[in-house]
């Protein structure tokens, strides 16, 4: 599933293509369940001739703000892609939503697994989303003191705590592994067992791995692409995730795969002991 760096990379590419443009018409909605707030007919009517004001991100969600104060919230889930292409470019069978733009291009949603969702909401819908999410780890409201307080209230293991979107918004399996490796913390440690120095190390590690991945335009393992269909490059810079059996770049010990909270997890058994 795309995590914060991937969704931020998509956001930036969509921003270049969409801000100031108009949704002209819904060309097709091949899988109606993708839009979970409106029928196809009402959705088509609601977005027609609406100008795009901003493209923002909250956690793993894209927020496309329209000129009538409504917002299209897009959750890519496992395999969703938001692509902006020429209208004459052929669409394959996994393209489930096509929206015409006023410059002759199209916004397309490509999703082989069909788990992605579009929700057209008013301001209260955006507020409800914000209310259930924790702070943005690259935002000003992510402070060391607040992070320490949140961890102190959690007796759960640190790995699933980092994946809890009400604790921290946007971190998923890849970057939890990467941050814990960088901070030299074992993922099975209880969140409330970390001392002040460990919390500070993890706080900085989370920001570092996310910023580095954004710089590399995200991690493409299978499906992730930006709005131009381009892959990310962060998969070539991972330290722990997906590197089972390969040497730890700090100590040379083979990276091991374990399961934590039913999630595949990658650790250095020496550095993170």
UniProtKB/Swiss-Prot annotation:
Paste the cofactor note. Answer: Binds 1 zinc ion per subunit.
**This enzyme's EC code(s):** 3.2.2.23, 4.2.99.18
> Is Mitochondrion included in the keywords of this UniProt record?
no
At which positions is DNA bound? 94, 113, 154
Q: Which Pfam families match?
A: Fapy_DNA_glyco (PF01149), H2TH (PF06831), zf-FPG_IleRS (PF06827)
One GO biological process this protein is involved in is: base-excision repair
- What UniProt keywords apply to this chain's record, in alphabetical order? DNA damage, DNA repair, DNA-binding, Glycosidase, Hydrolase, Lyase, Metal-binding, Multifunctional enzyme, Zinc, Zinc-finger
Name the needed cofactors.
Answer: Zn(2+)
Active site at 2 (schiff-base intermediate with dna), 3 (proton donor), 60 (proton donor), 263 (proton donor)
GO molecular function term, any single one:
8-oxo-7,8-dihydroguanine DNA N-glycosylase activity
SMART domains given for it?
Fapy_DNA_glyco, H2TH
Reactions catalysed, as given in the entry: Hydrolysis of DNA containing ring-opened 7-methylguanine residues, releasing 2,6-diamino-4-hydroxy-5-(N-methyl)formamidopyrimidine; 2'-deoxyribonucleotide-(2'-deoxyribose 5'-phosphate)-2'-deoxyribonucleotide-DNA = a 3'-end 2'-deoxyribonucleotide-(2,3-dehydro-2,3-deoxyribose 5'-phosphate)-DNA + a 5'-end 5'-phospho-2'-deoxyribonucleoside-DNA + H(+)
Signal peptide residue numbers: none
Q: What does this protein do?
A: Involved in base excision repair of DNA damaged by oxidation or by mutagenic agents. Acts as a DNA glycosylase that recognizes and removes damaged bases. Has a preference for oxidized purines, such as 7,8-dihydro-8-oxoguanine (8-oxoG). Has AP (apurinic/apyrimidinic) lyase activity and introduces nicks in the DNA strand. Cleaves the DNA backbone by beta-delta elimination to generate a single-strand break at the site of the removed base with both 3'- and 5'-phosphates.
HAMAP family reported in the protein's UniProt record: Fapy_DNA_glycosyl
Q: Which PANTHER family match?
A: FORMAMIDOPYRIMIDINE-DNA GLYCOSYLASE
Q: How does it assemble?
A: Monomer.
| Entry similarity comment | Belongs to the FPG family.
Q: What is this protein called?
A: Formamidopyrimidine-DNA glycosylase
